[in-house]
Amino acid sequence: GWKPRHVTLHNQNGIIAAVPCYLKYHSWGEFIFDWAWANAYDQAGLTYYPKLLIAVPFTPITGSRLLIQPNQDRTALQKRLTDAVSLLAEEEAVSSVHWLFTTENETAQLTQAGLLPRVSNQFHWDNAGYDSFADFLGALNAKKRKNILRERRRVRDAGIRFSWRTGHEATPTDWQHFYRCY
């Protein structure tokens, strides 16, 4: 599902800029739901896949997608990178190019370069100073607190278990499982 087609720019010392690009033959694992687009293409007799995706696989984290060494001319390299991505899209005959979860600054730069921005919503929870989950629950009214506790009890009673792992804690088996999920 994620065929790497990264764009890189080099000088005599090595890579100076890159864009993480993937050919996608489905929309799983992106956290952006474009099934309606794929369906519309199909109804019009067009092919939606493959598409070119600029993203970090399996994560909806906003971050830079125009990866440029700090000692380089950012403006010039941004143009070269976006031109290279457009050329790659033509070479691969993709239906479209999707830059996912770019920073506000990069979104503005890509829009200025003539790309259409994607507008979507993402919800974030900010800790308002709670020291524990119990502190968070204590700030809720009784009905909300009771509903959350009931939902968590149902999950536990169903035998569902979960654990948190950061990247360096994930084992090769974990990574294989993550990949199968998407």
Kindly give the residue locations of the regions a language model identified.
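N-acyltransferase acceptor-side catalytic subdomain
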Residues: G1-Y182
